[in-house]
Amino acid sequence: MGLIAMSERDLQRIEVLSKVIDGRMTMVSAAHVLGLSTRQVRRLLDRISAGGAASIRHKAIGRPSNNRICDGVRDYAMAIVRERYADFGPTLAAEKLAELDGLTVSRETLRQWMADAGLWLSRKQRRTFHQPRLRREAYGELVQIDGSEHRWFEDRGDPCSLLVFIDDATGKLMQLRFVRSESAFTYFEALELYLKAHGAPVAFYSDKHSVFRVAKKDAKGGQGMTQFGRALCELNIEILCANSSQAKGRVERMNRTLQDRLIKDLRLEGICGMDDGNAFLPRFMERYNRQFAITPARSDDLHRPLNLAPDRLRDVLCKREQRYVGAQLTFSFERQRIMLEENEVTRGLVGRYVETHAYADGRLDVRWKGHSLPYRVFDKDQRVTHAAIIENKRLSDVLAYIKERQDERPAPKVRTNSEKNGYTPRGRKPGKRTDFMNDPVVIARRRQALSNLDAAE
């Protein structure tokens, strides 16, 4: 007799029933141990005495399931799938088989059939593998930058974004900065700190965020370059955009590391806001780099000195745009109407373009050939436009701004239909109001009417 496969349950039953047969255990105790009734234990004992221990095994083992779909139905269904639905997913293919072909098969059964036939790959099998990119050889040759929106202060503070600058060759944290959201101004602030601390690298490596890249290929304004890209061009720094998040995997993995390590350090330090967090970040970077930074393949430092005065650097790290001056010496800027003060210089600027310099602290400078022009804000409206297109990375900041503006406005008053039609209540005439219920004339008329009613009856 060959080997017989048994489950753990069957082996336990044989062991307990053997003790009953040998007289070492009662039938009631065996039923309690096996979780069966005494009658079922008696049946199992009869089965052992008739067919041996092998008869304890479940009778359905080795037999096809009673609910098994026959091979003919399977072959017919797969023939239809190969012919018409080869590129369908199992869910959609099962729906179309039932709707168009009158063949009802569960989606999971069809999924297994299609997988066995090679028509469907599981999510794990479809996973694409990205070939790792070797590190750059020199320090300062390539710096990856990214922003990570997260609850960095957990429940102690509001969520914000962390701007991360990491050197590709060494894995060193070059610059960290807590900001409300990713924008050109916040990246200008982080870039200024980076340049003052390390100098100018060869290139930055980023994603396709609108801060770094103009999405429209045929953009007419700005020579197809963002404000951040224009500033880097003036500083002789290249900006490269990754085609996928996997391409800049080092900064993406660094974001996950910081979301673990940095959050716990902030909790231990009791830090609850961005200002205290930014003051703590230099100490965190120093400790992290000392522990995890690696030695590059080449010892060269490719950072270059800026050789720029602080005022000149601030003029580079700002938003610069051209604005057309109208006949009234006015132009539009950020939903504001700017009016130039009339003087000998501004009188000749009608029909010309002036240059606006917008700084991160809210200052606005209007220039003509490098000279500042006096102006005043004629009309100011900073409301977010209705149905404005907002990027996902700026959504939290914009919603906070909208909530602040809504709280400042008075609650809208809902007008009635009469008010919408122009009706105004005239009010009651002055004097004491007549009590018609106790008026003698009214009482006499009521009594006369009742008497007439009685006479008619």
UniProtKB/Swiss-Prot annotation:
Superkingdom of this protein's organism: Bacteria
NCBIfam families the record matches: transpos_ISNCY_2
Coiled coil: none
UniProt-recorded Gene Ontology molecular function terms: DNA binding
Region feature (Disordered): 406-440
Domain Integrase catalytic: 128-313
GO process terms (BP): DNA integration; DNA recombination; transposition
Alphabetized UniProt keyword annotations: DNA recombination, DNA-binding, Plasmid, Transposable element, Transposition
PANTHER family in UniProt: INTEGRASE PROTEIN, TRANSPOSASE RV3428C-RELATED
Official protein name in the record: Putative transposase y4bF
Species assigned in the record: Sinorhizobium fredii (strain NBRC 101917 / NGR234)
